[in-house]
């Protein structure tokens, strides 16, 4: 786990008010900012900090962006949609979800209807 700290008291005066990221898994300290001696991004062993007192500094990470995820749930049988293609007059109220919107199946073009059927009913995930 990584923790941010600002050193408020230390045996080594060069550490006073410096800001560090402590990685407890690697036992490493990464300097974020220091007045002297230490440089930004310098990595040292946590034990090299010696005796110190500190206050926690909140660390904010950017959200992970995984890309769009979308699920349309239509509770229908394949045969129902295929019959609606062949006999649209029997299904004037048949409504489905497409890209988050409710749409009447009969208002779609034949190409869109085939696409909905192909994407809705698959053999495996």
From Swiss-Prot:
The keyword Cell division does not apply. The gene is grcA. Keywords: Organic radical. Residues 5-125 form the Glycine radical domain. GO terms for cellular component: cytosol. InterPro entries: Auton_GlycylRad_Cofactor, Form_AcTrfase_GR_CS, Gly_radical, Glycyl_radical_cofactor_GrcA. It comes from the Bacteria. SUPFAM superfamilies: PFL-like glycyl radical enzymes. GO terms for molecular function: formate C-acetyltransferase activity. Acts as a radical domain for damaged PFL and possibly other radical proteins. NCBIfam families: spare_glycyl. The modification Glycine radical is found at residue 100. It holds the Pfam family Gly_radical. Signal peptide: none annotated. This is Autonomous glycyl radical cofactor.
């Amino acid at each position: 786990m990584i923790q941010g700290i600002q050193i408020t008291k230390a045996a080594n005066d060069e550490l006073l008010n410096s800001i560090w990221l402590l990685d407890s898994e690697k036992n490493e300290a990464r300097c974020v900012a220091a007045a002297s001696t230490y440089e930004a991004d310098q990595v040292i062993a946590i034990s090299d900090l010696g005796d110190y007192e500190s206050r926690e500094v909140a660390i904010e990470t950017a959200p992970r962006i995984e890309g769009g995820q979308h699920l349309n749930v239509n509770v229908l049988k394949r045969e129902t949609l295929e019959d609606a293609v062949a006999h649209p007059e029997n299904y004037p109220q048949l409504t489905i979800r497409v890209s988050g919107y409710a749409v009447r199946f009969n208002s779609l073009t034949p190409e869109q209807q085939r696409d909905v059927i192909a994407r809705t009913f698959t053999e495996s995930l």
